A protein has these predicted regions:
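Pre-Walker A-like glycine/lysine-rich segment at the N-terminus of P-loop NTPase domains
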Residues: 2-53, 74
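Nucleotide-state sensing region of NTPase/ATPase domains
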Residues: 56-145, 149-150
Length: 152
């Protein structure tokens, strides 16, 4: 018999710097169901993408991390994108942070460096995955739910 341990976790605060269309965003998240509404291109999907990025350290929108760096910031010689989540897991308060740093490399080039911190301590993605959990379903994934077994 396998015992399943349920984790009580909720996101309390999300902070974004130079992420997608946001130069700065600070959101206090209430401990209840949250509904994101607004016109197109206002950042609703970007907020969801940021939350997912902090759980998986990859985007569900792109396979190129450089594309999530704010367009205007990416023009600078040194560009930094920062995502921070303050959350509570069971009864423990935690902070997870991801930094994407575009820095000069070679002649006219830039390289992207990713830093991940858990409670202020640098860690590898493998060490941190599973500390902050998120699941995303987008319309493109409908075949996973609705499709025939062979499609899944």
């Amino acid at each position: 018999m396998q015992v399943l341990h349920l984790i009580n976790m909720y996101l309390k605060h999300l902070s974004l710097t130079n992420f997608r269309g946001f130069t700065r965003l600070d959101l206090d998240i209430p401990q209840r169901v949250v509904l994101l509404t607004g016109d197109n291109a206002q950042g609703k999907t970007s907020v969801l993408e940021a939350i997912y990025f902090l759980a998986a350290f990859t985007s569900f929108q792109t396979h190129v991390d450089r594309q999530i760096v704010n367009f205007h910031e990416a023009k600078n010689p040194l560009a930094v994108t920062r995502l921070v989540a303050d959350y509570q897991r069971d009864k423990t308060k935690q902070r997870i942070e991801a930094r994407l740093i575009l820095e000069p490399s070679g002649v006219n080039g830039q390289r992207l460096r990713k830093e991940i911190l858990l409670d202020g301590v640098k860690k590898s993605a493998n060490e941190v995955i599973g500390h902050f959990n998120a699941v995303v379903f987008v319309p493109q994934m409908s075949q996973i739910i609705e499709g025939a077994p062979d499609d899944r």
